[in-house]
């Protein structure tokens, strides 16, 4: 298993994650956040891509040994799902945000049957909305969702509630808490910035930048 600290280091090193508690980012949700994540960058770095694929494959092999299909959440989860499915020698599928408006109107691409045991892969978990919508589509197709794995989770309170309500477990390779700890150890953030970053995770909507 690839250590969570290694994945966090990888994300920081390649600029997939940017920490800026003094100059917060505006998310699409309207939330002000001291962090911005673009895990799509990971596919451009072979060593990082390998760490992620190996880590996810190992996680699934040990946590979900009965998995019969690896399914990526479109679009960012597709590449990682393909790499993991190849390592585990399992079928792969992917789930769109909504059914196509032409052709056969498919939402799920690849082969999936009602007897399948599916593990969903996404690159990033904020509230969990995208991957939980994908899980709903898989369940509607008759298959069983064993759980969700991801590269990185913000550990936001809303995501904890949402996954509990959906009856699904989330297992990320690394987390916000681990990443900011690694960033402080590497002198990428100061002690006051660390305190601000912790406050944001506890109360993201009420957080004020330093």
UniProtKB/Swiss-Prot annotation:
Keywords: Glycosyltransferase, Magnesium, Pyrimidine biosynthesis, Transferase. CDD domains: PRTases_typeI. It is an enzyme of class 2 (transferase). It comes from the Bacteria. One of its GO terms (molecular function) is magnesium ion binding. The keyword Glycoprotein does not apply. Pfam families: Pribosyltran. 5-phospho-alpha-D-ribose 1-diphosphate binds at residues 96, 100, 102, 122-130. One of its GO terms (biological process) is 'de novo' UMP biosynthetic process. Orotate binds at residue 126. It catalyses: orotidine 5'-phosphate + diphosphate = orotate + 5-phospho-alpha-D-ribose 1-diphosphate. InterPro entries: OPRT, Or_phspho_trans_dom, PRibTrfase_dom, PRTase-like. Its cofactor is Mg(2+). PROSITE patterns: PUR_PYR_PR_TRANSFER. Its EC number is 2.4.2.10. Pathway: Pyrimidine metabolism; UMP biosynthesis via de novo pathway; UMP from orotate: step 1/2. The keyword Iron-sulfur does not apply. HAMAP family: PyrE (MF_01208). PANTHER family: OROTATE PHOSPHORIBOSYLTRANSFERASE, URIDINE 5'-MONOPHOSPHATE SYNTHASE. Homodimer. Belongs to the purine/pyrimidine phosphoribosyltransferase family. PyrE subfamily. Catalyzes the transfer of a ribosyl phosphate group from 5-phosphoribose 1-diphosphate to orotate, leading to the formation of orotidine monophosphate (OMP). This is Orotate phosphoribosyltransferase.
